[in-house]
């Protein structure tokens, strides 16, 4: 229907898939530590008790602070953030310290996080002219990774390479990169309409409701549109 259309892979979905793989590394680490968490230490020697306690603290970090691996808010990982006492860790730590220890205890997780940061840097700093060169370097870095969950992501990037490069095309009208943000927003709005109504049995009524909600020129809004006086609604 549109032979000249450029198909683009939205960065949100690509990073989401990479985050899933990073989380698999975290879960694998937790499973390896679970035996120490459940160990009976009644008759154990001092060395075994010390090791088990250390492993339990590591398990606690990966279980409690898993969200730190995926946050995009630099305020959380600010090294100057106030440190607070943690009963389990028995010391004063901020989120930057905790993230540091999570990566320190598992070199594979650290490697996965470094590649995730490289992917985010790629999307922030590359452009259409350099995207092909940059993505080839990124694919090579992923392929050289020793972490199985992460190295296989190179195949995903290779398969969608053209679509990823197309996502750096900037539209002249708005000066924005091509993405599926508008479509995702419309789909979410329609799902909310269906959810709030507990479903529709009449197609025409459902269609009219969707068109009314998505139409910017509707005469009534729950919140006044920007630049309009409330009395004009």
Per-region residue spans from a language model:
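Short alpha-helix plus adjacent loop in nuclease-associated cores
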Residues: 14-38
